[in-house]
């Protein structure tokens, strides 16, 4: 989701929708190989001070998280306009959802509810700043979030999965006038938005503004030790084992796989 830095989208801080290059080729220039052809690198690459040897493995993992999952979680919180004192719900406990917890806390959320059914992810979410865990899904999950918020619903719902169920859940738990930040890649059927007309909900989201967030907020937060998103990487694999890395994520054997180039 890198941008050119010059088009209207990039100038507005939404380089995930960059008009300066063909987004359909975003993943066709060697992004899972030893070398990458990176367009618009003069603007979109983010320089990290010093040398790799200056940093611990944990710090390098957190810096790597700035290439995708942390900015994506931050994007959900930004477009949902999470503010100080808000009650926020995060739908999804993958790496992006966990980073959305970090982002909500960074932006001052007072209460952060994560919808999660996996113990290892629940523990990490609590470490990152979540205050409540909701294991239920569907109507039961919606009812639980509403119970936790005295029937009001949340000020912001961060949808980090992209399924029909997760999207409908995010819409159902948002209070009237709330915002839904959608960063889960959509794989949904038709959703009848007329059902939510009287809710006055704001729905926003899409590919994250990685470069903008890294340069303005996230790189400094990592280097200063304020956040540690690299903890989402729970297994490492060689490039030759990339198929296994994907399989283990799909089977919930790891939260986020790290590919190490030998």
Model-derived regions: residue spans:
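Residues in the short beta-alpha loop(s) of Rossmann-like NAD(P)-binding domains
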Residues: 117-118, 186, 209
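Rossmann-fold NAD(P)-binding glycine/threonine-rich loop
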Residues: 184-199, 215-219
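N-terminal Rossmann-fold NAD(P) dinucleotide-binding loop
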Residues: 97-98
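Adenosine-nucleotide cofactor-binding segment
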Residues: 90-93, 105-169
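ADP-ribose/adenylate-binding Rossmann-like module
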Residues: 172-189, 203-204
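NAD(P)H dinucleotide-binding glycine-rich loop of Rossmann-like/cofactor-binding domains
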Residues: 4-91
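A generic alpha-to-beta junction signature in SAM-dependent methyltransferases
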Residues: 80-82, 149, 161, 173-175
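C-terminal hydrophobic helical "lid"/dimerization subdomain
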Residues: 168-172, 212-262
